[in-house]
């Protein structure tokens, strides 16, 4: 009966077109429903992390390239793109970031879930405190911009008045976000939050680029004016003042003060973008409970030589800056003497910093402590930024070396060989300092503080035993050693079981090692501040060195410097932050 009924049904469908059409439409409808449900499931599933990272990274990169394209068009000065167009574009980006930060903070407040996971290594409190100080200086700069707009409001675009207001609001909101949310490890709405965080990263990068471009334009304008006054070149300057009278008496003070605050605003935005990038990398990350612990800061006893040497370096830098800026406007002989003074000072500084970093590396060679290879996005980013920002100075240095060697047989300034020595030492100094900082960041710290006055001997064995010993038994042995042993003395587990040969043994007390490293960190810390101050406030003798201008041409050499000097400024300030972190944890 079943077979007969099935045959009849097939016969009816075959010879009845209406029935066949109904069955066909029913099957196609079922197929569409299955396809729709499958597509719905695939869209509602969690988007793959790598795909979300790639999409958001491409969005941010293209956003940055769009902004840089507008800046390059603005650099032509005679083109259709004006400053108000660039500022309007950046203002829109800041408003979008403000909306995202507001939505994120409101959602965090409304959620009744437990406190989100937080990365203990992201955004140390002292870094956020330093950024707060830089933000205050940025707010002062915004106030000067608003005052400048009020004075010239009759002949300049309204975008120049809206921009500082939005920037001030953006700065205040962003500092609040950094203090209360930068450590969050986001686990909900990951794809949406990736785009929000990466938008904030590249918005700050664009603000950094805008600050660098404005500061460079101001420096180049003064540089051309000085060359014209000294008769070095037949150049023409571009009038950068508005074509109307200022309605207040402090417009010139506002415009002049802006460029003394630009270095702080530039460093603020580049550091914020780095911290937000770490937050972006932490989205969806599973934290390691063992490594995600905040280590205590160590003591600072025995600090004398490092701070003293750093203060001498800082005082020397300020003196060189003042003398250089004064003599630069005088006669050609005094101008050449000022440039020579800078290079002599630079050679002495580079040599001292090479010795300091090399001594720190030698101290590390005296201990048998393994490297920390755990996952830490903040530390990885620190290392990558150190190496990437070194490229600017290295390019500038090797160009100077090529120019000095190429002009060796011809008439050259008196400081040509000093410039060659300075360039080579600059390359060496950054190589050694990078090694010292990176090894310090990756060196594993002991969980217990060592007593500097304890009569212990720090023994070094070659080759190291790390990787041979089973660390799983160390905790058990430590527990047994803590128990008092009757009639016997327990040996410290920090000493090897067998005595070392005399040629492979080096005795250094832990307290002495800590003092040496802390003094080195403090000395390098203040030296990097000194080397940041000079170019940040106008001491840039590379522009006044005729060797590179004759070898590469003025346009090529100026382009190299306009790229290399901002990277060098960031390198010095980033080294300051890294060295202070090493100083606290060593």
Swiss-Prot record:
GO terms for biological process: cellular response to insulin stimulus; inner ear morphogenesis; negative regulation of type II interferon-mediated signaling pathway; otolith formation; otolith mineralization; proton transmembrane transport. Changing residue 398 to A: Abolishes homodimerization. Impairs surface expression. It is a multi-pass membrane protein. Residues 484-505 are annotated as: Disordered. It catalyses: H(+)(in) = H(+)(out). Residues 75-82, 148-157, 218-255, 327-336, 406-417, 538-555 are extracellular. It is found in: Cell membrane; Cell projection, Microvillus. Disruption phenotype: Fishes display the backstroke phenotype. Mutant fish exhibit otolith agenesis without additional effects on the sensory epithelium or other inner ear structures. Otoliths are essential for the perception of gravity and acceleration. Larvae without otoliths are unable to orient dorsal side up and rest mostly on their side in contact with the ground. Changing residue 394 to A: Abolishes homodimerization. Impairs surface expression. Changing residue 574 to A: Abolishes proton channel activity. This is Proton channel OTOP1. It comes from Danio rerio (Zebrafish).
